[in-house]
Amino acid sequence: MDLRQYVRDIPDFPKPGILFRDITPLLRDPAGWHEVIQRLVAVCDRWQPDLIVGIESRGFIVGTALATQLGKGFVPVRKPGKLPGEVIGIDYTLEYGSDRLEIHADALSDHPKVLLVDDLLATGGTASASAELVTKAGGELVGCGFVIELADLAGRAKLPEGVPVESLIIYG
């Protein structure tokens, strides 16, 4: 199944010059969404994660569906101030500024094997920071999975060396 048929291109969103790859038609289509999750399940069969970690916010959609299908737990990586209780955080730089991501301090304290997921790998800044946060929190990063990768933006190069990456749809 060609998953690209379910991705809508939105020019000039969120600002002029940007071509946004919208996965909401994919989420709406039961057959397309099922195919996404089954392909990611196959990835997990190779990498054998104990937990799925998803990056805010569309990584929650991908990650919870995958975790449910696998019978695994799910852990969210969130923007600052969104998680109650004790957190571990990481600050990272963006093209035009900086940001912070957080995870519960005890979420990975038992050193599980983790698959990090999100809907999109673009420049790699958020994914790279999330990967570092997984390690900082005690997890062993066994792989990264994305629905879409914008290869022209070279985000894959920012991810930890030696960690396998699987993207279901690659543009550029």
From Swiss-Prot:
It comes from the Bacteria. It catalyses: AMP + diphosphate = 5-phospho-alpha-D-ribose 1-diphosphate + adenine. Pathway: Purine metabolism; AMP biosynthesis via salvage pathway; AMP from adenine: step 1/1. Its EC number is 2.4.2.7. It is found in: Cytoplasm. Its main location: cytoplasm. GO terms for biological process: adenine salvage; AMP salvage; purine ribonucleoside salvage. It is an enzyme of class 2 (transferase). It holds the Pfam family Pribosyltran. One of its GO terms (molecular function) is AMP binding. InterPro entries: Ade_phspho_trans, PRibTrfase_dom, PRTase-like, UPRTase/APRTase. One of its GO terms (cellular component) is cytoplasm. Keywords: Cytoplasm, Glycosyltransferase, Purine salvage, Transferase. Belongs to the purine/pyrimidine phosphoribosyltransferase family. NCBIfam families: apt, PRK02304.1-3, PRK02304.1-5. Homodimer. Catalyzes a salvage reaction resulting in the formation of AMP, that is energically less costly than de novo synthesis. This is Adenine phosphoribosyltransferase. It comes from Synechococcus sp. (strain WH7803).
